[in-house]
């Protein structure tokens, strides 16, 4: 299974924010600069993460974005569920004539659930805490 760039950059944005000192604000521009992604794309991602409570956005002169909850309470599997369309095949009867007898959808569904259950074993904190090489790459002190 390959994650969409939307989910990939959503996870990267959260990793960046989790690497900062707790509560420190950053900006969408800073995140886009670190990862080399378009600002418009990142704005859409941050908006969805904000609606889901993973990011807090503060407007104004001293505003910015930061994690909306502690890194240790954000499970990677939950973020993927929020951002990723998880339907691996199009099983509409108009599209596929074997849908009534097909067992592939069930097998793929079980595989996706196993994938997500494994990701649920990791929090953002697990990915960033005591990860000096990551801090160096992200230019975080």
From Swiss-Prot:
Cofactor: [2Fe-2S] cluster
Gene Ontology biological-process annotations: negative regulation of DNA-templated transcription
GO function terms (MF aspect): 2 iron, 2 sulfur cluster binding; DNA-binding transcription factor activity; double-stranded DNA binding; iron ion binding
HTH rrf2-type domain ranges (all copies): 2-129
DNA-binding residue intervals: 28-51
Primary role: Nitric oxide-sensitive repressor of genes involved in protecting the cell against nitrosative stress. May require iron for activity.
Name of the protein described by the UniProt record: HTH-type transcriptional repressor NsrR
Name of the gene encoding the protein in the UniProt record: nsrR
């Amino acid at each position: 299974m390959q994650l969409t760039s939307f989910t990939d950059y959503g996870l990267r944005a959260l990793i960046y924010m989790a690497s900062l000192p707790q509560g420190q604000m950053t900006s969408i521009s800073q995140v886009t600069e670190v990862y080399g992604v378009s600002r418009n794309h990142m704005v859409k991602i941050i908006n969805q993460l904000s609606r889901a409570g993973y990011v807090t956005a503060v407007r104004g002169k001293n505003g910015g974005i930061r994690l909306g909850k502690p890194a240790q309470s954000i499970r990677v599997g939950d973020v993927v569920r929020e951002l990723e369309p998880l339907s691996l095949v199009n099983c509409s009867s108009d599209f596929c004539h074997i849908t009534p007898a097909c067992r592939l959808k069930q097998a793929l569904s079980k595989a996706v659930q196993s994938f997500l259950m494994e990701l649920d074993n990791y929090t953002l904190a697990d990915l960033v805490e005591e990860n000096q090489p990551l801090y160096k790459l992200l230019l975080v002190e």
